[in-house]
Amino acid sequence: MKTMIISSSPNRIGLTNSCVDTCIKTLQELNVETKWIVLNQYNIKKCEACGKRGWGICLEEHICRMEDDFNNLQEEMGEYDNFIIVSPVYFYEMSESAKTFFDRLKRFNDNSKIKGKKIVCIACAGGSGTEQKKH
């Protein structure tokens, strides 16, 4: 079994990455192959809603015309059985990098590389996860 963990926090020492560390440790104890993807380290542009009625070649050819890291990441996702998505909560929403990624992934609907696969989403709220300094 292979699980891809996708996180979307730019803070390398915060609560979100602490959750990722726990997931990785637990999965490794269960002998599950894991890969950690940090969305903020990828060049993933916002969807431009190209083509007719805002649907470009993504609807028919199942690839995006934009030249960034999205197509390769989506292709790699097809090699995994399960996904854990971990995002900080910013202003009652997932992070911008997570939102951008999901907006692009959604354009592929029924032909997505992750169709039928299991996904767990973890929303991390409540602070940075680092110790607070007292003044």
List the predicted regions and their residue ranges.
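Short, glycine-/small-residue-rich phosphate/pyrophosphate-handling segment
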Residues: 96-97, 109-135
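N-terminal beta1-alpha1-beta2 submodule of the flavodoxin-like/Rossmannoid cofactor-binding fold
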Residues: 1-108
